[in-house]
Structure formats: structure tokens, C-alpha cells
């Protein structure tokens, strides 16, 4: 039986030390699975630091391709551009999308790819069952999960770490909404199978995300569900009218917060929506 193509897509911005460590661990873990020709697609998000990819002989990785974006656009758009490139350049393949900092553990790839091969109509998502951040960060994350669920009725406890057959890419890229958040586009447009894994430890340095970045990312995840959010907020308002009609203050605050949320989501959409992925960010292709 002919080996099937499997391409691991990794967005990178400046963190080349982590990428090199990740490639070593990916190569080691891929030895556990047979029947696949494994390749790596690195989407360089216009890094300002010198590109350093150590050319080692990888027994289980046949090719490494570097996609150099002309301008920095963030990991979510970088993933969308990478998927768009794969969709137009290859046919009948498997893809694993993962971050390059070590938090997505390479040891999970074999399990995810095996499931993706068995269930080709599904996207396999790696959900975090235990987080190692501070209590404050975990609290914020849980607030985000609950907030998103109450607005969208979707429990989005996974990030970029996903595996799937190539036929799912057209759904993920539907209406170019994956540029907001890969996870939201997956759960909105695809059937998913959840697996659960511990979050890995970053190889080097700490995350540069601050509180405002986390809030914006939470809003980006919700942006794909704007129509549903409008509907759910109306339903909640009807509930308030029935049970709290005498409390003008509650109604006023709720209306204000609802419209404030609509405005924030509108601004996020305006900032991040890409009308045409193929024309948005020109790139240079380089084989390592």
C-alpha cells in the first residue's frame, strides 16, 4: 500500500530555538507510526530575527518547506494562509496544525493522525485537560470558556492543535473566517472528535501575550458566531424582561453591555477579516 502524505503545519514568529527542538521531538515520535510520508510546512510570520533551522538528518521527515510571509499577520492568519497554500498545492493528504513553542506535545501526533486516518470526515482536536499556568491565568481561561459557551453554545477548549484529512480544509477556510480563530472555524464548520491531553511546557522563554491580547483573542474566537450571539443576547433579554422587568437598572446595564459587545466584535471583524487569502499576503517558498 502506498504511503499517505502527512504535512505538519507550524506557524513561527522569531522562536527558532523552540522550532528546532520541536522538529527533533516530532521526528522521534513519528517513528511510532507507519504508512505515512511526513513533511513539515513552516509558516514564517515575517520574523524579525534571523531564520535558524538546523539541518539535521531526520529519519521520519522527508521534506521541510519554509513559507516566508512578506508581512507579519499573527498566528491565526498564518495558519489560514498555510492551509490555503496546502489546499492549492497538494491533493489527498493529512494535515496536523500545531504551535511551535512546545505547548502542543509531539507525543500526541500519532494518536491524532491515527484517528484522522480512521475518521476522514472529522477534525481531531486536542483539548487541554490540565493547564500549568498561574491561578489567575487559569481563572481567566475558565471565564473565557464559560463566556463563549453562554454566547455561542460551543465549548471551545482546544486551540490550534488539530489533525484532519485534506477534504476538511475547504470547510475550515469557508468564507475566510479562519483568519479570526482556527479553533472557532473548525468547531463551526466541521465535525470534530475530541481527545484530551496535558498542555506541554514551553521550550524557551515565556509567552509575550498580555491581558489585552488574551481579551482580543477571546473576542476573535466569538467573532465567527456574530449572528448566534445577537440571537442569544436577545433571548437572555427576554428572560430579563420576564423575571426582572421591574428592575430598570438591570435592563439598562444589560442593553449597554450587549451593544458594547456588538461594537467590539464589529471592530474585531473589521480589523482581522481577509476577503481573499490568496492575495492577502504574498509569500516566498523555500525548501530546507
Question: What is each of the regions a protein language model found here?
Answer:
Residues 5-7, 39:
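Cell-envelope/extracellular polymer assembly enzymes that use nucleotide-activated donors
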Residues 15-31:
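Short, well-formed alpha-helical segments that are part of the catalytic scaffolds
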Residues 15-19, 47, 105:
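Donor nucleotide-sugar binding loop of glycosyltransferases
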Residues 35-47, 67-68:
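Short beta-strand/loop segment that forms part of the nucleotide-sugar
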Residues 44-53, 102-103:
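A conserved acidic beta->alpha catalytic loop
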Residues 70-71, 76-85, 94-97, 103-179, ...:
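Acceptor/aglycone-binding surface of glycosyltransferases and processive sugar-polymer synthases
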Residues 170-229:
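Catalytic donor/gating beta->alpha subdomain of glycosyltransferases that bind UDP-sugars
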Residues 230-288:
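Membrane-embedded multi-pass helical conduit in multi-pass membrane proteins
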Amino acid at each position: 500500500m502506498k504511503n499517505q502524505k502527512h504535512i505538519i503545519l507550524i506557524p513561527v514568529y522569531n522562536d527558532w530555538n523552540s522550532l528546532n527542538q520541536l522538529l527533533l521531538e516530532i521526528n522521534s515520535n513519528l517513528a511510532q507510526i507507519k504508512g505515512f510520508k511526513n513533511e513539515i510546512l513552516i509558516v514564517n510570520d515575517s520574523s524579525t530575527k534571523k531564520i535558524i533551522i538546523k539541518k539535521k538528518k531526520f529519519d521520519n521527515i522527508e521534506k521541510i518547506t519554509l513559507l516566508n510571509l512578506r508581512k507579519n499577520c499573527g498566528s491565526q492568519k498564518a495558519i489560514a494562509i498555510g492551509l490555503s497554500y496546502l489546499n492549492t498545492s497538494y491533493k489527498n493528504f493529512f494535515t496536523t496544525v500545531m504551535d511551535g513553542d512546545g505547548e502542543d506535545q509531539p507525543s500526541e501526533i500519532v494518536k491524532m493522525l491515527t484517528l484522522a486516518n480512521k475518521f476522514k470526515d472529522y477534525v481531531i482536536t486536542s483539548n487541554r485537560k490540565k493547564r500549568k499556568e498561574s491561578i489567575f491565568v487559569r481563572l481567566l481561561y475558565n471565564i473565557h470558556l464559560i463566556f463563549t459557551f453562554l454566547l455561542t453554545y460551543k465549548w471551545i477548549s482546544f486551540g490550534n492543535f488539530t489533525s484532519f484529512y485534506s477534504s476538511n480544509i475547504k470547510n475550515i477556510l469557508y468564507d475566510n473566517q479562519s483568519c479570526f480563530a482556527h479553533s472557532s472555524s473548525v468547531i463551526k464548520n466541521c465535525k470534530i472528535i475530541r481527545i484530551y491531553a496535558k498542555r506541554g511546557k514551553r521550550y524557551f522563554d515565556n509567552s509575550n501575550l498580555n491581558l489585552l491580547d488574551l481579551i482580543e483573542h477571546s473576542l476573535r474566537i466569538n467573532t465567527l458566531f456574530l449572528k448566534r450571539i445577537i440571537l442569544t443576547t436577545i433571548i437572555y433579554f427576554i428572560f430579563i424582561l420576564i423575571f426582572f422587568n421591574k428592575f430598570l437598572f438591570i435592563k439598562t446595564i444589560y442593553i449597554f453591555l450587549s451593544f458594547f459587545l456588538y461594537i467590539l466584535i464589529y471592530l474585531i471583524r473589521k480589523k482581522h477579516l481577509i476577503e481573499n487569502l490568496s492575495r492577502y499576503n504574498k509569500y516566498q517558498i523555500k525548501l530546507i
